[in-house]
Amino acid sequence: MNIVKTDVPMTSQLCHETVLALAERYPSIRAETMTETDFGRPVDLMMMGKGERKVIFTAAHHANEWITTPVLLKFAEELAQALESGGRIFGVPAQTLVKAATIYIVPMVNPDGVDLVTGAANRREVARAAVFAENYPGIPFPDGWKANLNGVDLNLQYPAGWLRAREIKFAQGYTRPGPRDFVGRAPLSQPEVKALLLLTEAVEPDLVLAFHTQGEVIYWQVGGIEVPGARRMGEEFSRLSGYELADTPEESAYAGYKDWFIQRYRRPGYTIEAGLGENPLPLEQFDKIYRDTLGIMTTAATGLPGE
């Protein structure tokens, strides 16, 4: 019987309980809490494998993109099941994968925001967010919410052109806490982001994947920086998923997790914009999203021949 639920809206409690249950059921999954949000919700981390190659997968930087969380949870569960049965995942022997790679999975970077969008936030939190939302009446509430409960967009918090991101977003009118695109008062001001940055600095991974929605597109570079091997890997991701491989738009090329990673380490980093439609995407899209991205996750972990 599967532990990961893919047919109900995701909440921070469901994510946390799922992570704990997976770690209890499968010895191949190790779990810990990276940090807590300002509102006391845990930001979970799962680790699998003990290989030399290191990769970090993240999901739900943005609240209304929570469908990416069960994608990573299901990947972890299917890999653990394949290890138990001596089977394969996306055609790759599970034992081969975990001997080659160590996989770090952060399934929900923004638990506060996710709870707001999926109806699990408490009354006081909803009221606080509603006040922020009043500054942006053109954004649906709560479905248009991407930020955390401080009204800060977590994927605009990294020290990679943060001042330029602020300039762009302020010019677009995002000058105060709200549902989306507010960069905060300073980079790394939010504990969720600081914890992920510290994890990344501790691990120094060979590659990172940041799962978002939507558009069925893969963004692979930033600021004209072309990391050796990154295009080749991106083209393979595109082939496996059917997603377009695209340059990051200039207005979105600053202060994001993938942007910071590429600038900091000159290693491959990818934003995976899964699914199609208007966020939050319906759960009816989950199966297709998972099928489309399973090869990306598996190949990111194994690497390409000759790497």
Per-range role (PLM):
Residues M1-T18, R25, R164-E307:
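C-terminal accessory segments enriched in acidic
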Residues D7-R53:
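Soluble metallo-hydrolase cores and metallopeptidase-like ectodomains found primarily
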Residues A31-M34, S85-A94, L245-P249:
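Surface-exposed patches in mature extracellular/periplasmic domains of secreted proteins
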Residues M34-E36, M48, A59-H61, V106-P111, ...:
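Active-site-proximal beta-strand/loop segments in catalytic clefts of secreted hydrolases
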Residues M47-G49, K146-A147, W162, W260-R266:
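Short glycine/proline-enriched loop/turn "hinge" motifs that connect secondary-structure elements
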Residues E52, I67, K74-A76, A80-Y219, ...:
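Active-site/substrate-binding loop(s) of hydrolase catalytic cores
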Residues K54-I56, Y270:
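Conserved beta-strand elements of the Class I
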Residues A63-T69:
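Di-metal (Zn2+ and/or Mg2+/Mn2+) metal-binding site signature of metallo-dependent hydrolases
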